[in-house]
Every structure is written in structure tokens, then in C-alpha cells.
């Protein structure tokens, strides 16, 4: 048969299959924009700012609607009430991890982020317990973060108040905290192996937030056959996993079951004590990879965005420094006990996280069983997208949400004001494992920097662009330089 005829027949069959699948599912799922065959709603979604497109859809279809990413449907939850109802009130039913083909290819169903069912519960429980035993949210981890904050300050002094791009320096600090927990040692900020590791993570975040990755995720059949930045992401991930495996092998040589030094030792001991299918060397490497990915680049990007916003709003930086001077002074390091006496600084850090909206659409969830949600039937295994933008930028909770204003988290008396709408770490069963650590790092690193330096922009604040250059998976700030002027 003529190859052209075969191709045409194949395309026709694919179109018919796509049309049938979309029509058979749409009658049961929540309403949404009409999808095109094969490509779904891709052309109706801005790959550079997905959350903006979802907001437009919600204005027409309400807080619960369906979009087709390729041939696969995803139910979108938009607004605080819908997100809370699903992730918190029905936490067990919405606790599944949805499909993210590029990262699924990296994790291979292992680790803590992209696993499901019993394996996920076992690894998450073990990781939380181990991190807690090593002092996560307690004194010993605070000591490590304080030590790293002092190293960060010394590294910033070496810039001699000259213009610098803070990307890698700010990446070193949170990465070293994770290293101390997982490997029992930190790296020098000039260590070539360490800097290469950071470079791989930084590049992967940019790739993950690019429009091309949205295409790869929506059409996973293309991943193995087309060239593109997704290949770099896979190579970078392999490099990091090989680095971790070498560290694991070193730990195996000197393992003392009666004296575990770090996370890797604890995992290896667990492997020896229990013959769990969940606890294997491959699972250990992927779990450590997940902890690095979640605990390094997210905090580093938030710190970078923090400095950019403080340069844009020098009056806010001045007020924070006044509070630091009043509460902490110059002769001791900041500690977590200070936070309760520093409502303005606490409000600024919360507002930074709210404003930058780091992970606009959260990681995908999936329902673990057939469920009726707000009178709609959602079959088991359906992907769920939760718009964190719609919560963090809710106009009722945060008047003028597009404006950076620490007053969003202050009451009339200047006291810190909590908000149920503050969920940059997600919510429910899948809330970020490292939330306590991230909050500690943001407070101690930022207060340490502002205790020792005045931030000086190279351009007028009004000329600084604070718009995210990528807004797909993660909101990535534009590149910028500044001077750290010792005070």
C-alpha cells in the first residue's frame, strides 16, 4: 500500500480515536473549553503563563472545569474554596500524584515526589521521621542553617561591594543545608563539583518552566524521538543521580548501624533491617534527588526573587533593617526565636512568597478513586490541576493582589496576621515535605543578609523589571545584578 495512504489512514484513525475519547469523557467531567482533536486545548492556553489562561477559563466555566492537555483531560480547581475542599477536606481522595511525563521519566516511579500508593506513604513517612529526628524544625537543623548563613555572609563580603549576579551564591546556601542533612558535610562555595551540581539544578528549573516542556508533557510520545532542551534535562538529572550514587557507595563503606550520621545512613540501615521493596538503592538515590530538587532550587529562587523585590521597594528593605537593628542588633546571629518579635519581617517574607507565586499551578494531583465532587463525576486516575495563583492572588483575601504589599499580612496594630489563603507549599496530604526547613532558611538567610549589608541596585528602582521571565512550572525571576554594601 502507498505509504502516503497509510499515513493518511493512520491520521484519520488517530483523529477518530481522539474525538471519541474526548466526547466519551466530556459528558461526565466538569464543563470546559471545547478541545481540538489530538491537541486538546493546547492552542487556547498560553504556555508562557498557564495560570493566566486558567483564570480566563474560570471566569466562563466556574471554579471547577476541564481542560484537555493533548488527548488527556485534567480537571482544574480554581479558587480557595475548591482547592481547600479537594486537597484538605477530601485529602485522601485527592492525594494521588498526577502525570508529569518528563519527571516521571526521571523518577521511574521511585522517590518521594512522583510516587503513589503504599510506596509513596512508606517513603514519605520515613523521610519525615528521619528529617525530624535530625532536627528539622528543631534546634540542630537551626544550628546548621545559622552556620550556613554565616558562610553566606562571608561569601557576600568577598564581592567587595562590586556588582554581582547573586544566582549561584544564593544557590549554594540552601544546597549546603541539604548536603549537611543528607551527606553529613557541606561544600566550599568555590568547589567545582558543587558548582556544577548547582548549575544542573538551575538549568533544569529553567527547562521545566519553558513552553517546550509543556509540549513534551502533553505529548509524551515525542520525548524519545525529538531533539530539544528536554534531552538536556534528562542528561542533567542523570549527572546528579550519578553524583548521589557515588556518595551512597562511600557511605556503604563506612556505615555504622549504631551511629547513623545522616539521611543516607538512616536509609541504608532501613534497607538492612527490613526487606522492603520500597527501600532499595535506586529508591534511595531518587529520594535524595527529590529532596535536593525540592529543597535547593525552590528556596534559592525565592531568595533571589526576595532580593529583587527589596531592590524594587527600598523602603521595605529599610523597615526590615530597622526591625533587625531593634530586635537582634549587630552582635549576634538571627535565630528562629526572633521571628515572633519581628512581625514586619515575617509579613515581608510571607508577602514575597505570595507575590512571586513560585509554583503557579502546583504539581499535578490525581484522584485515587471514582469520586463525586461538586455534583461532577471524576473517574479514578483523572489528573487534577490546582491553581495556587487563584488562592495566593485572591482579591478578597489580598486586596490589590498584583501589588507587593507586606500589609497583606499585618493587622491594624502592626501585628503579624495569618491567612488560610497562604499556601505556597500546597496543602493537604501532598504538602511540601520540607516546608518547615524552607521557612527557617528564608527567615535566617534574609535577616542575616540584611543585618550585614545594604542592597544597592545598579539602576533606579522604578526601572527594575520584576516580571517573571518564565512562568510555566516555576516562576523564574529575570537576571539582575546588585551590590552588597557592608553596614
From Swiss-Prot:
GO terms for cellular component: endoplasmic reticulum membrane. Cytochromes P450 are a group of heme-thiolate monooxygenases. In liver microsomes, this enzyme is involved in an NADPH-dependent electron transport pathway. It oxidizes a variety of structurally unrelated compounds, including steroids, fatty acids, and xenobiotics. It is a peripheral membrane protein. It is found in: Endoplasmic reticulum membrane; Microsome membrane. The gene is CYP2C16. This is Cytochrome P450 2C16. Expressed constitutively in liver, lung, testes, and kidney. Its main location: endoplasmic reticulum. Its EC number is 1.14.14.1. It comes from Oryctolagus cuniculus. Induction: By phenobarbital in each tissue with the exception of the kidney. InterPro entries: Cyt_P450 (IPR001128), Cyt_P450_CS (IPR017972), Cyt_P450_E_grp-I (IPR002401), Cyt_P450_sf (IPR036396), Cytochrome_P450_fam2 (IPR050182). The keyword Protein transport does not apply. It catalyses: an organic molecule + reduced [NADPH--hemoprotein reductase] + O2 = an alcohol + oxidized [NADPH--hemoprotein reductase] + H2O + H(+). Belongs to the cytochrome P450 family.
Amino acid at each position: 500500500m502507498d505509504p502516503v495512504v497509510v499515513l493518511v489512514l493512520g491520521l484519520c484513525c488517530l483523529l477518530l480515536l481522539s474525538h471519541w475519547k474526548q466526547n466519551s469523557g466530556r459528558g461526565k467531567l466538569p464543563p470546559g473549553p471545547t478541545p481540538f482533536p489530538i491537541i486538546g486545548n493546547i492552542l487556547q492556553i498560553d504556555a508562557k503563563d498557564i495560570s493566566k489562561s486558567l483564570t480566563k477559563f474560570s471566569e466562563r466555566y466556574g471554579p471547577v472545569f476541564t481542560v484537555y492537555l493533548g488527548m488527556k483531560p485534567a480537571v482544574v480547581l480554581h479558587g480557595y474554596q475548591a482547592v481547600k475542599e479537594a486537597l484538605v477536606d477530601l485529602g485522601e481522595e485527592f492525594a494521588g500524584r498526577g502525570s508529569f511525563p518528563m519527571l516521571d521519566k526521571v523518577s521511574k516511579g521511585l522517590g518521594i515526589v512522583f510516587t503513589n500508593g503504599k510506596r509513596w506513604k512508606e517513603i514519605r513517612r520515613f523521610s519525615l521521621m528521619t528529617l525530624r529526628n535530625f532536627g528539622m524544625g528543631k534546634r540542630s537543623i537551626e544550628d546548621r542553617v545559622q552556620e550556613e548563613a554565616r558562610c553566606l555572609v562571608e561569601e557576600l563580603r568577598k564581592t567587595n561591594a562590586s556588582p554581582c549576579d547573586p544566582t549561584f551564591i544564593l544557590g549554594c546556601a540552601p544546597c549546603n543545608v541539604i548536603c549537611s542533612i543528607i551527606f553529613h558535610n557541606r561544600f566550599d562555595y568555590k568547589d567545582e563539583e558543587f558548582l556544577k551540581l548547582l548549575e544542573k539544578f538551575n538549568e533544569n528549573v529553567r527547562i521545566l518552566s519553558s513552553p517546550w516542556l509543556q509540549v513534551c508533557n502533553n505529548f509524551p510520545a515525542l520525548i524519545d524521538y525529538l531533539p530539544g532542551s528536554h534531552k538536556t534535562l534528562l542528561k542533567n538529572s542523570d549527572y546528579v543521580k550519578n553524583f548521589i550514587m557515588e556518595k551512597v557507595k562511600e557511605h556503604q563503606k563506612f556505615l555504622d548501624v549504631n551511629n547513623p550520621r545522616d539521611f543516607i545512613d538512616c536509609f541504608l540501615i532501613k534497607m538492612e533491617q527490613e526487606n522492603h521493596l520500597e527501600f532499595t538503592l535506586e529508591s534511595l538515590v531518587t529520594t535524595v534527588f527529590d529532596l535536593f530538587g525540592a529543597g535547593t532550587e525552590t528556596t534559592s529562587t525565592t531568595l533571589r526573587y526576595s532580593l529583587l523585590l527589596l531592590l524594587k521597594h527600598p523602603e521595605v528593605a529599610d523597615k526590615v533593617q530597622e526591625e533587625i537593628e531593634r530586635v537582634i542588633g549587630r552582635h549576634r546571629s538571627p535565630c528562629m526565636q526572633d521571628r515572633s518579635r519581628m512581625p514586619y519581617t515575617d509579613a515581608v517574607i510571607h508577602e514575597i512568597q505570595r507575590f512571586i507565586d513560585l509554583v503557579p499551578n502546583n504539581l499535578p494531583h490525581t484522584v485515587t478513586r471514582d469520586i463525586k465532587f461538586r455534583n461532577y463525576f471524576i473517574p479514578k486516575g483523572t489528573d487534577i490541576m490546582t491553581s495556587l495563583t487563584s488562592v495566593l492572588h485572591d482579591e478578597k483575601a489580598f486586596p490589590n493582589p498584583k501589588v507587593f504589599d507586606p500589609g497583606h499580612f499585618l493587622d491594624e496594630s502592626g501585628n503579624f496576621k495569618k491567612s488560610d489563603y497562604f499556601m505556597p507549599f500546597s496543602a493537604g496530604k501532598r504538602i511540601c515535605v520540607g516546608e518547615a526547613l524552607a521557612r527557617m532558611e528564608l527567615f535566617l538567610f534574609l535577616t542575616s543578609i540584611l543585618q550585614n549589608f545594604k542592597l544597592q541596585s545598579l539602576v533606579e528602582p522604578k526601572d527594575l523589571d520584576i516580571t517573571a521571565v518564565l512562568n510555566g512550572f516555576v516562576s523564574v525571576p529575570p537576571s539582575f545584578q546588585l551590590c552588597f554594601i557592608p553596614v
